[in-house]
Amino acid sequence: HPAYAARAAAQSTVTLQLPARRGNFYDAQGRLLTGLEERWQVVCFPGQGNYDRLYACTDAAGQALLYRSRSRAAPFLLEVSCDPARLGLTGYPAARRYAAVPLCQHLLGYLDSTGHGAAGLEKALDAVLSGTGENSSLVCAVTAQGTLRTGETARLLQADSGALGVQLTISRPVQRAV
């Protein structure tokens, strides 16, 4: 029966939302003020056996997520700081918004927990920087145990949020020195 087949297919498909792309701030020479640290999102599948390798490549929040999700029956996304290709994994770029030592944070401001501007230029220019807020997503055909079905790969569904960057008249080297 086609309706049962469609329902079964829907139950065995997991869609994971990648972080929405947000425009960056640039200095007067076009150098990045935000998005300086390269990061990746990696899809983790139950029983994949890469938890040990990923543990060293993520921060404390990621390590806690790995620990909580070790017996999970569905795939999940994990942010890592090392290139996933070196680990034999597929990663999706997702730069860390602010450097460990933020640049001109009094001017740029910061984001709230939903990824929208909460203060400074991040708030004032939120509509430009976030665009439509659309996310790209990964669609995974999984088994009942949450592992990727044999012969399948995660499909990336690209979405363009239309987010734009903003160039400021300040200088990154001067801001680093301050």
Regions of interest found by a model, annotated:
Residues H1-T15:
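Aromatic-capped interface at the extracytoplasmic side
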Residues Q11-L16, F45, D112, S161-T169:
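Second-shell loop/turn segments in exported
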Residues Q17-R21:
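Short, small/polar residue-rich loop motifs at catalytic or cofactor-binding pockets
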Residues T34-R39, A56, A61-A163:
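Small/polar-residue-rich segments within soluble enzyme cores
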Residues Q41-Y51:
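A short, polar/charged loop-to-alpha-helix boundary motif
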Residues R155-A177:
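A conserved hydrophobic secondary-structure block that centers on an alpha-helix together
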